[in-house]
Amino acid sequence: MNGDDTGWVRAAARRDLTEGEVLGTEVAGHSIALYAVDAEIFATENICTHAYAYLSDGWLDGEVIECPLHAARFDIRSGKVLDPPATEDLKTYPVRVVGDEIQIRLD
């Protein structure tokens, strides 16, 4: 393993994530949401920063995920809050695809 591979962990199989969809998964004890948008893959924490709800149960509209509990909206690229009641941004994670594996870096 070279230095470029440090910190990367498997999040899901690429075939499990459909374009325009969100997939919730557990990675090393972290709840992660994976998104496939415009042939790119993004990763954020899967728990809304306003109240405990899985974003993977919400609605994905382009690059925006809406929380199913109180309709807070976040930009999946940056994690930025777009609409209240959330006031805290989501944590985002670097993503890469290696073969059929989606990998994220947690550090």
Question: Model segments located where?
Answer:
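N-terminal pre-ligand scaffold of iron-sulfur
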Residues: 1-62, 75-76, 89-107
